[in-house]
Amino acid sequence: MQRTRHKGLISLRAIVFSAAAYAGGGPLGIDHQVQFDQSGIWSRHNQVTLESLTFLTIAGGALWEGGESRLGKTYWRAVDSALLATVAATAGKYAVERSRPSQTSDPNQWRQGSGHYSFPSGEVAFISSAITPFVIEYGHDHPWVYALELLPAYDSIVRV
């Protein structure tokens, strides 16, 4: 009896929190408009530079190191991961067809047809997938490697 009531309360909470998340523009109200800013570190140029340097680093590192060393294997995992994430994000864009913030003020515009490919972010997926193999491989030995996780966070903020 006690267990059934506990499960019922969990279900009720899930329904209430789901409704609140939907009403608030996504989970925890995170899907809302923010001020557009292209100055300083938020400029589009910096984001493109980050993506280009990430590509050059993982591709160059993989070719330079080869696949025999620990570092070389990690570079090749990053290349594989980045390619897979790019393909998956592109497929997701065509499946979801979400409008960009510049196209609408409503964050719930999904399945809008051709030209609406805001989500998922291919650039954030690329950066995330490129650093993840390094975090997994070296994070426990060198905790500073976890700081690489700031790159996708930065990239996702700049994308807005």
Predicted regions span which residues?
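N-terminal signal peptide c-region/cleavage motif recognized by signal peptidases
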Residues: 18-20
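…; additionally, a secondary subgroup of soluble metalloenzymes is captured
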Residues: 15
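Hydrophobic alpha-helical bundle signature of multipass membrane enzymes
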Residues: 22-120, 124-159
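Bacterial N-terminal signal peptides that target proteins for export
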Residues: 2-12, 45-46
